[in-house]
From Swiss-Prot:
One of its GO terms (biological process) is co-translational protein modification. Keywords: Hydrolase, Iron, Metal-binding, Protein biosynthesis. The active site is at 148. This is Peptide deformylase. Its cofactor is Fe(2+).
Length: 196
């Protein structure tokens, strides 16, 4: 089922997600709905808070990046078909020299900004089988992981840009909060909850 994506300004996007257990209600359905919602919105990642759930789950599928001819062939190959569910994730290390990439977010439509992140990340997480694993990722896969991980920590990519850039996008952010934006995917907005 395609779920509405929560827009900027909703308090759920600022909550630190709660860890879950294997008996979390409708877990498989929740994850399937998250993937379906992400694909419907042409995203490469989606975190549970973005569908209104303050829990520690995010899903990614970097396949759309694999067509980028500006990337080295080996990275294109890594990106193609990389699909993963991260449950109760914890980034244990970020390393390397920060690099900039123009990021966007399904919860913040029509806003894109350059964000600096480290190129390599070590992360502990469970997949749907709840077996804990530790893996190292780099490049765009690491970046997507860091972006989605931020969501389960209550952090948005707009928190990582300069105060000048924040001022320049303030009107857009206010419009999103008030639901004054149009997307081809379903969204719900903080102002609508207040009787707007």
């Amino acid at each position: 089922m395609i779920l509405p994506i929560v827009g900027y300004g909703d308090p759920v996007l600022r909550k630190v997600g709660t860890a879950i257990t294997p008996d979390y209600p409708n877990l498989k359905e929740t994850i399937a709905n998250m993937y379906e919602t992400m694909y419907n919105a042409y995203g490469v990642g989606l975190a549970a808070p973005q569908v209104g759930l303050p829990i520690r789950i995010f899903v990614i599928d970097t396949t759309p990046f694999s067509d980028d001819e500006d990337l080295p062939a080996d990275e294109q190959k890594d990106l193609k078909g990389f699909k993963r569910t991260f449950i109760n994730a914890k980034i244990v290390k970020e390393e390397g020299e920060e690099w900039s990439f123009n990021e966007g977010c399904l919860s913040i439509p029509d806003v894109r900004e350059d964000v600096y992140r480290k190129p390599t990340v070590t992360i502990e997480y469970c997949e749907e089988d709840f077996v804990m694993k530790t893996e190292v990722f780099d490049g765009l896969i690491a970046r997507v992981i860091q972006h989605e991980y931020d969501h389960i920590e209550g952090v948005l990519f707009t928190d990582k840009i300069s105060s000048l850039k924040k001022r320049l996008i303030q009107k857009k952010l206010k419009n999103i909060t008030e639901g004054k934006t149009f997307q081809e995917y379903r969204m719900k907005f903080a102002a609508a909850k207040k009787g707007r």
